[in-house]
Amino acid sequence: SKIIKSKIIPIFVSKLQNMIKLGEYNILKVVKIVDFGVYLDGGEYWGEILLPKETAPAECKEGDELKVFIYFDSEDRVIATMTTPKAIVGDFALMKVVGTSRVGAFLDWGLRKDLLVPFREQREEMVVGREYLVYVYVDKTTDRIVASTRLSRFLNKTPVEYELGQEVELIVARRTDLGYNVIVNNSHEAIIYRNEIFQPIIIGQHLTGYIKTIREDGKIDCILQKNDGHEQIDRLAVLILKKLEENGGSLAVSDKSDPDEIYRLFGCSKKNYKKTVG
């Protein structure tokens, strides 16, 4: 049976990739309307794919083309939905753990069937109720959509010729002793140093940033402001004034306060706080 399985899987994967984009949006034609939904043309391999009534358009007819998300339901049937998931295959997204079992943790990704993070794909043991930044992909051995918190292995390790000062899209991935690890343009890993952060940021947040340095080892440093001088200080000053107004003109912090308390309130280092307040 093992030999048969090893022969079947590559064919299955090939068919899957060629016919339907699992975990992504597909444009499929309505071929039949029934009481419990509509059937869509999934091609020669998949045949008719059900779009259940609860997510199907109220008015549609045979021959209409619908943009649908394709995944496996709880009974491992290929199924379509017009509900928008929190992420599709190839995305990084922040999701909450809603359950655990002997196979892994389950995330709420906006669909009826929760998204599995297998134990081997957990950077640390995942806890119900907590949110994690995950990468969504198709497991090639099972052909199931799963997620992983082991983000680094899905990022490009090949150095890219970014230009210094180039504007890039960032996703905040993880807090470290030095600052925050971020994902650059959905592709590369970089760091923003704590003493160069002048605003509160959270895991999973999407930000616009800029390339500050590309080191000899290929590692990337980013900043959130185009200039690393007065502009950041001005932004921090505005934030401090806003906090003062919200608290009747006084704050329970000073340049003698604990650095972590200053960071919690203003998202900056104690050094930058002192520089701003004088």
Where is each model-derived feature located?
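Single-stranded RNA-binding regions, centering on S1/OB-family and related RNA-binding modules
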Residues: 3, 9-278
